[in-house]
């Protein structure tokens, strides 16, 4: 009898929840006829919750681990897109994700009247599951009254499932999804320009084709643009593992910068920016540069500021070019810490670049240097001499744009927007540091912080053999300085702290010696024990302690 009563209770409870679900679904469907935008915006999220199996692979952003028996097949599939395709295909297209926002972000209230947005996603031979998961995350986690359309720009994909199959599939989605086909492989930059030209939203939001938007991602971006239409905003970019598709929250304590080679890099948010925000981490972070894959911009302002440089090829450098242009021409660039979007970070690209990756990036970087970096372009050319050899085309239109917009000089950008830049404003020399005795050069060997500086045959190609002897008497290689903490070394590379101490060196232009002030020893040739690293020895004036600093008059 008790079992019978228990069964009736369970059945009644289950039936009640089914009826509640049906009622809510019908109720919110009817809200299409009402005026309350916020209620209507809940419909896609509600449907997703009702239909989802919360225990499936990858739910709540959990890692998907492939059994040992399938490892070989997994590795083969990995090569197609340079991420774990097998894991991705096991995960639901509308999988659940954790709410990774700061607690203060969860209670923020945004204005009712926000600008709407077109979401532009460029893809080339993208995997079905990652592309559709990107689209579903946009639709399911965006209020539909703010979502004008999703524009998919196909950059000449060759895979059949990305043609008619995709077109038929997106017809049934709840938000208008438009597919634009590029006639030939054109690259991210020109494909985005095509998508932007076709957009109708007041704001354009660019996303990569392997992203996942989280709860509340869109409103903070649009609210900031509503406050200032000349503000270009980026979400915090969370990490989706290319191996397991685990969703990992990104840090709100990093912002965008660049190194000597004009490679985008993440750096800790400086104290001055924390002070400006009065310690409130839910406020946007002013960032010198953006990663470039994910951002929102007022559509009219995008046109006014000069869209993208259409003379650049494929991708690479366009993010820094746009970052410099926005700041130098009166706009601002921010990371909105209450917005989170995940991105699959790959260790390698599965695509080829016409002419080779190096050629494309060198051309793009040369264009941005010629237009935006003023005299600092010469610093970059010493670091990367190969850039000077490429044909970078005509930049007269971009220079005219800069003149018409009355943009500020690059020195202003470094002093006011990016004072933490790794580019030394004053230096005595820039280039190789060559040992007179061995005719070898100091070389950072591509090593990281807290590793020994090396010495190697001089190659004259810049890169790892470019060091700057700064006006602060540091020996710098990018953001690392040569540091000696005890007698007889070793000489290691540490973050430059600008406090002199272990990083203070005196160069004697007559004796050609580099004396470490704290230890009162001189930089010397390698020992027999390790011929790949320089040593520290008592100063003797020998040829092995003599060093020639390239371009010694430059920057004095």
From Swiss-Prot:
UniProt GO molecular function: carbohydrate binding; metal ion binding; polypeptide N-acetylgalactosaminyltransferase activity
GO term, biological process aspect, one: O-glycan processing
Free-text tissue specificity from the UniProt record: Specifically expressed in neuronal cells. Expressed in fetal brain, whole adult brain, cerebral cortex and cerebellum. Not expressed in other tissues tested.
Pathway: Protein modification; protein glycosylation
Annotated spans, Catalytic subdomain A: 114-224
Residues covered by region (Catalytic subdomain B): 284-346
SMART domains tied to this protein: RICIN
Cofactor: Mn(2+)
Topological domain ranges for the Lumenal compartment: 28-556
Pfam assignment, any one: Ricin_B_lectin
Stretches assigned to the Ricin B-type lectin domain: 428-550
Membrane topology annotation: Single-pass type II membrane protein
Transmembrane parts of this sequence: 5-27
Compartments it resides in: Golgi apparatus membrane
Record topology, Cytoplasmic segments: 1-4
Binding site for substrate: 155, 185, 315, 346, 351
Domain remarks: There are two conserved domains in the glycosyltransferase region: the N-terminal domain (domain A, also called GT1 motif), which is probably involved in manganese coordination and substrate binding and the C-terminal domain (domain B, also called Gal/GalNAc-T motif), which is probably involved in catalytic reaction and UDP-Gal binding. The ricin B-type lectin domain binds to GalNAc and contributes to the glycopeptide specificity.
Function (record text): Catalyzes the initial reaction in O-linked oligosaccharide biosynthesis, the transfer of an N-acetyl-D-galactosamine (GalNAc) residue from UDP-GalNAc to a serine or threonine residue on the protein receptor. Generates GalNAc-O-Ser/Thr structure also known as Tn antigen, which itself is immunogenic but also serves as a precursor for the synthesis of different mucin-type O-glycan core structures. Contributes to the synthesis of O-linked glycans on mucins and proteoglycans of the central nervous system. May promote neurogenesis through glycosylation and stabilization of PDPN.
Family recorded in the similarity comment: Belongs to the glycosyltransferase 2 family. GalNAc-T subfamily.
Record-given protein name: Polypeptide N-acetylgalactosaminyltransferase 13
Species this protein is from: Homo sapiens
Gene this protein is translated from: GALNT13
């Amino acid at each position: 009898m008790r079992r019978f009563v228990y069964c009736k209770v369970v059945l009644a409870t289950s039936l009640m929840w089914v009826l509640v679900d049906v009622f809510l679904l019908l109720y919110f469907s009817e809200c299409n006829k009402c005026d309350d935008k916020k209620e209507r915006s809940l419909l896609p999220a509600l449907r997703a919750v009702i239909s989802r199996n919360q225990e499936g692979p990858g739910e709540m952003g959990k890692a998907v681990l492939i059994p040992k028996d399938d490892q070989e097949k997994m590795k083969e599939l990995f090569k197609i897109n340079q991420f774990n395709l097998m894991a991705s295909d096991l995960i639901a297209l509308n999988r659940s994700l954790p709410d990774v926002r700061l607690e203060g972000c969860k209670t923020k209230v945004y204005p009712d009247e926000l600008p709407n947005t077109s979401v532009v996603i460029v893809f080339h031979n993208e995997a079905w599951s990652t592309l559709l998961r990107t689209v579903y995350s946009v639709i399911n986690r965006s209020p539909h009254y703010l979502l004008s359309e999703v524009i998919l720009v196909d950059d000449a994909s060759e895979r059949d499932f990305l043609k008619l199959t995709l077109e038929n599939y997106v017809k049934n989605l709840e938000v208008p999804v438009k597919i634009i086909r590029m006639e030939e492989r054109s690259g991210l930059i020109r494909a985005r320009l095509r998508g932007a030209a076709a957009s109708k939203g007041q704001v354009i939001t660019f996303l990569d084709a392997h992203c996942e938007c989280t709860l509340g991602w869109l409103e903070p971006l649009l609210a900031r643009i509503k406050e200032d239409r000349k503000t270009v905003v980026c979400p915090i970019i969370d990490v989706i593992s290319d191996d397991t598709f685990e969703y990992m929250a990104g840090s709100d304590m990093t912002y965008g910068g660049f190194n000597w080679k004009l490679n985008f890099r993440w750096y800790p948010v400086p104290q001055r920016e924390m002070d400006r925000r009065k310690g409130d981490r839910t406020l946007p972070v002013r960032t010198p540069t953006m990663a470039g894959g994910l951002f929102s911009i007022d559509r009219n302002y995008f046109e006014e500021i000069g869209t993208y440089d259409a003379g650049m090829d494929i991708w690479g450098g366009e993010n820094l070019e746009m970052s410099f242009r926005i700041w130098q021409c009166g706009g601002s660039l921010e990371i909105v810490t209450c917005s989170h979007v995940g991105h699959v970070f790959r260790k390698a690209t599965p695509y080829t670049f016409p002419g080779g990756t190096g050629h494309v990036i060198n051309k793009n970087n040369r264009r941005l240097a010629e237009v935006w970096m003023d005299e600092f372009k010469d610093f970059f050319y010493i670091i990367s001499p190969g850039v000077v050899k490429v044909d970078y085309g005509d930049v007269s239109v971009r220079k005219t744009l800069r003149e018409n917009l009355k943009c500020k000089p690059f020195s202003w950008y470094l002093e006011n927007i990016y004072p933490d830049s790794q580019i030394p404003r004053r230096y005595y020399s820039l280039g190789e540091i060559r040992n007179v005795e061995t005719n070898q050069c100091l070389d950072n060997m591509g090593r990281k912080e807290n590793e020994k500086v090396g010495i190697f045959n001089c190659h004259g190609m810049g890169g790892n053999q470019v060091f700057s002897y700064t006006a602060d008497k540091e020996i710098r290689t990018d953001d690392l300085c040569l540091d000696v903490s005890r007698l007889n070394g070793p000489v290691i590379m540490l973050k430059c702290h600008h406090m002199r101490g272990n990083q203070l060196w005196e160069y004697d232009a007559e004796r050609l010696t580099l004396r470490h002030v704290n230890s009162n020893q001189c930089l010397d040739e390698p020992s027999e024990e390790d011929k790949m690293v320089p040593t520290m020895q008592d100063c003797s004036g020998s040829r092995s302690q003599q060093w020639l600093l390239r371009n010694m008059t430059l920057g004095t």
